[in-house]
Amino acid sequence: MKFLITLIITTTAMISNYETQKYDVILSDNNFEIRFYDSSLKARVASDRSANGNFYKLFQFISGNNSKGEKIAMTTPVYMKNDENQNTMEFVMPSSYNLETISQPKDKDVIIFKSEAKYYACVKYGGYSNSKKFNTHSKELLKKLNELSINIKGDIFYVSYNSPYKVFNRRNEAMVEIIYEN
């Protein structure tokens, strides 16, 4: 029992030290937010594999399966999108990297790219996420955007900020790109 408590505390401490992608909050209403994200460097895997398979490929990349054999720090959040044809997962790269300095992946399925600056809307929720919770919060997100007469661009996706080992105070989001004029 003592070991388990130590493991949970240590893991939580390690996870809380992850760099988190920066954004500006434009509008906040309870668990709903409109945000502006500047461009950022990301690594992406898109495949017909499960999310676990995509995570493994991205984790291998940041663990040294890259042109420099270097370990790249884990950051938050992790972006996930599932549709009928493929699952996509993206890791945000640490802000100290750019396209010229980031190690190149050895795995051809891992793509490095610079995202565009965009507006997003999200609904935040806690606990361990599952498809039922995600669908509930996605509907809440669409309802709020409809109330505000804000149009979406693309599909809603899932964003996770925590390791699966974190038990308390988990942070998840249903998020979508929006057409927004500030």
List each model region and its residues.
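A solvent-exposed interaction/effector surface
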Residues: K2-N182
